[in-house]
């Protein structure tokens, strides 16, 4: 079993670019189509580690879905981000849904 470092609804930062994001899904290993060598420079160890579907904002404040390796992310220590309140709201909404899911018939 592979343990993931981050959880769904957790706020994270891109380690190199510093962008704030929210984890919306986790894959136990890289699971998109087989990348060509020039598209993704990864080794087998990196591909076998968890990968995260993360929502971030572009420069215009529009949501962008990204797919990132665990090694590309770091924990976010702050709970509030006045410059990106939509990321705070998304994280709260996801965590709330995980704590009290609605049952459907």
UniProtKB/Swiss-Prot annotation:
This is Heat shock protein HspQ. The keyword Cytoplasm applies. It comes from Citrobacter koseri (strain ATCC BAA-895 / CDC 4225-83 / SGSC4696). Its main location: cytoplasm. InterPro entries: Hemimethylated_DNA-bd_dom (IPR011722), Hemimethylated_DNA-bd_sf (IPR036623), HspQ (IPR022866). It is found in: Cytoplasm. SUPFAM superfamilies: YccV-like. GO terms for biological process: response to heat. Residues 74-105 are annotated as: Disordered. GO terms for cellular component: cytoplasm. Belongs to the HspQ family. It holds the Pfam family YccV-like. Involved in the degradation of certain denaturated proteins, including DnaA, during heat shock stress. Keywords: Cytoplasm, Stress response. The gene is hspQ. The lineage of its organism: Bacteria, Pseudomonadati, Pseudomonadota, Gammaproteobacteria, Enterobacterales. The keyword Lyase does not apply. GO terms for molecular function: DNA binding. It comes from the Bacteria.
